[in-house]
Swiss-Prot record:
Record bears the keyword Phosphoprotein: yes
Domain of life of the native organism: Eukaryota
Name used for this protein in its record: Epsin-3
Organism: Mus musculus (Mouse)
Ranges for region 3 X 3 AA repeats of N-P-F: 523-635
Lineage, top ranks: Eukaryota, Metazoa, Chordata, Craniata, Vertebrata
């Protein structure tokens, strides 16, 4: 160990430098040889660490600021900086551009040694190279790419080197002789000389390739576990389960045969293993046959097969024994059972049918024509039309209905159905009663009133040539009720029978006064501007005004002449009795008796007057009408 190396180690311990700073100090030492490539490669790798990067760059800037006698510190620091720009982190170039002034000052570096040799020229040339690399970004990018490729190539070439190369990297801290310690052994001297890179670029490339390959090996995903072991375990578990099942079956059957004892032949064992498969196949066949039979029952559109039964059910899934034995005439869409037709008597059907299905004489299509039911007392059906013959009047309870006549024949045998949209028939009510019903001002009719929930109370008019029915008039149902055989019809009393012969001489006063019919509107919300309002709540002002004579004779005040109080101005208005009466309009002598003084004496009250003044209406003088500004106010 040289004296400079020993002194450097002591300084490292005294100043407590970190590992990165120690490496930079060793690479930029004052020794007469250049920095080794392996050491610079380690420093370049440290620049990718944030903490180590700050320590490395701090020591480099300190070395660049040394004095002239330590020109090797400056030169080696520039050499290390050039190497870091090409192979280190990109932050090195960024920080060098920030401290570009520090590098530019080294262009004028001067130092002449004792022999008179200018040693500063080496520093000035190195500064020019570094400055050119920093200013040209494209060149810096190319240099970095080329250095990376060289490092990878050298790493691939160095993969065949044995473990003897490891001694090349092992060294004692701060000892420059440690880099050649591996060559001291004559055993590995020849191999190391052949594998050792000739240039620093090759050495750096080998190191980078080695690091990349080790990193790739570490990041390689773990290969998936083989499924062979899992398959073997699954087969073993299945075999054990099968054996346990066989043992359970044998113990349940109590079989002591050689089969149960484990001496079963191989052929019987195969047959026994195939039995579950056969059972499964049989179950599948049974399921298919059951499904096919269900589909046959569900085929309701196919013609029914010939069966000995004479009845056929309307149910598509009926019992096959109830199908007809002969093919029905006509197409398959021929007469069929109506689901809404009356149910026949119970003895006509077989008791084997659980839902009392309707018997028909044709195929079982539920959407076909209605067949003729067998004779017999029909069962009450809430959906079937009524059978007794009666004539419904035109003024029934249904305001939208029409007169319909039903017959006692079969409800399904040709009777016309009830049509709610048919044209209503003419009313049989006498014309005189209809005219009198229209003449009634109250809107009440002796027999019928239009059923309109949104209409007014005016009497109904004829529509479509007949009177509209009244919903609550039950008198029209009297004709539909059957007559009892033991009772005679009670005669209906009429005005002629009640009043006698004098009824013909009476005059109907209601028919003489006819109220004007208001415009009928079917829409209660159609109240536009064109429709006049039926009543005006503010129409009090339209009444006739009283004449002057009526006002004079109708409201005398305290015995005054009809013309009003003496001295009252023409057109003045007298005050109401509910308000204080002004003294200027009524004389004192006219309002109070003469015996009553105006001011009562002390301790006594004036007796009330015999009569209070009557309320006076507004009067107008005989000289002319009211002024134009006095309008008619309906609230006065």
């Amino acid at each position: 160990m040289t004296t400079s190396a020993l002194r450097r180690q002591v300084k490292n311990i005294v100043h407590n430098y970190s590992e990165a700073e120690i490496k930079v100090r060793e690479a930029t030492s004052n020794d007469p040889w250049g920095p080794p490539s392996s050491l610079m490669s380690e420093i370049a790798d440290l620049t990718f660490n944030t903490v180590a990067f700050a320590e490395v760059m701090g020591m480099v800037w300190r070395r660049l600021n040394d004095s002239g006698k330590n020109w090797r510190h400056v030169y080696k620091a520039l050499t290390l900086l050039d190497y870091l720009l090409k192979t280190g982190s990109e932050r090195v170039a960024h920080q060098c551009r920030e401290n570009l002034y520090t590098i530019q000052t080294l262009k004028d570096f001067q130092y002449i040694d004792r022999d008179g040799k200018d040693q500063g020229v080496n520093v000035r040339e190195k500064v020019k190279q570094v400055m050119a690399l920093l200013k040209d970004e494209e060149r810096l990018r190319q240099e970095r790419t080329h250095a990376l490729k060289t490092k990878e190539r050298m790493a691939l070439e160095g993969m065949g080197i044995g473990s003897g190369q490891l001694g090349y990297s092992r060294r004692s801290r701060g000892s420059p002789s440690s880099y050649t310690s591996a060559s001291s052994s004559p055993r590995y001297a020849s191999d190391l000389e052949q594998a050792r890179p000739q240039t620093s670029g090759e050495e750096e490339l080998q190191l980078q390739l080695a690091l990349a390959m080790s990193r790739e090996e570490a990041e390689r995903p773990v290969p998936p576990a083989s499924h062979r072991d899992e398959d073997l375990q699954l087969q073993l578990a299945l075999s054990l389960s099968r054996q346990e099942h066989e043992k359970g079956v044998r113990s349940w059957k109590g079989d002591d045969s050689p089969v149960a004892n484990g001496a079963e032949p191989a052929g019987q064992r195969r047959q026994r293993d195939r039995e579950p498969e056969r059972e499964e196949r049989k179950e599948e066949e049974k399921l298919k046959t059951s499904q096919s039979s269900i589909l046959d029952l569900a085929d309701i559109f196919a013609p029914a097969p010939a069966l000995p039964s004479t009845h056929c059910s309307a149910d598509p899934w009926d019992i096959p024994g109830l199908r007809p034995n002969t093919e029905p005439s006509g197409s398959s869409w021929g007469p069929s059972a109506d689901p809404w037709s009356p149910v026949p008597s119970g003895n006509a059907l077989s008791r084997s049918q659980p839902w009392d299905l309707l018997p028909t004489l044709s195929s079982s299509e539920p959407w076909g024509r209605t067949p003729v039911l067998p004779s017999g007392p029909p069962i009450a059906d809430p959906w079937a039309p009524s059978s007794p013959t009666r004539k419904l009047p035109s003024t029934g309870a249904d305001p939208w209905g029409a007169s319909m006549e039903t017959s006692d024949t079969s409800a399904l045998g040709g009777a016309s159905p009830f049509d709610p949209f048919a044209k209503p028939l003419e009313s049989t009510e006498p014309k005189e009663s209809r005219d009198s019903a229209q003449a009634l001002p109250t809107g009440k009719s002796p027999s019928t009133v239009e059923l309109d929930p949104f209409g007014d109370s005016s009497p109904s008019c004829k529509q479509n040539g007949m009177k509209e029915p009244e919903a609550l008039d039950l008198g029209v149902l009297g004709e539909a009720l059957p007559q009892q055989p033991g009772k005679e019809a009670r005669p209906c009393r009429t005005p002629e029978s009640f009043l006698g012969p004098s009824a013909s001489s009476l005059v109907n006063l209601d028919s003489l006064v006819k109220a004007p019919l208001a415009a009928r509107t079917r829409n209660p919300f159609l109240t536009g501007l064109g429709v006049p309002s039926p009543t005006n709540p503010f129409g009090a002002g339209d009444q006739g005004r009283p004449t002057l004579n009526q006002m004079r004779t109708g409201s005398p005040a305290l015995g005054l002449p009809p013309g009003g109080p003496v001295g009252a101005p023409v057109g003045s208005m007298t005050y109401s009795a509910s308000l204080p009466l002004p003294l200027s309009s009524v004389p004192v002598g006219a309002t109070l008796p003469a015996s009553v003084s105006v001011f009562p004496q002390a301790g006594a009250f004036a007796p009330p007057p015999a009569s209070l003044p009557q309320p006076l209406l507004p009067t107008s003088g005989p000289m002319g009408p009211l002024p134009p500004q006095a309008g008619t106010n309906p609230f006065l």
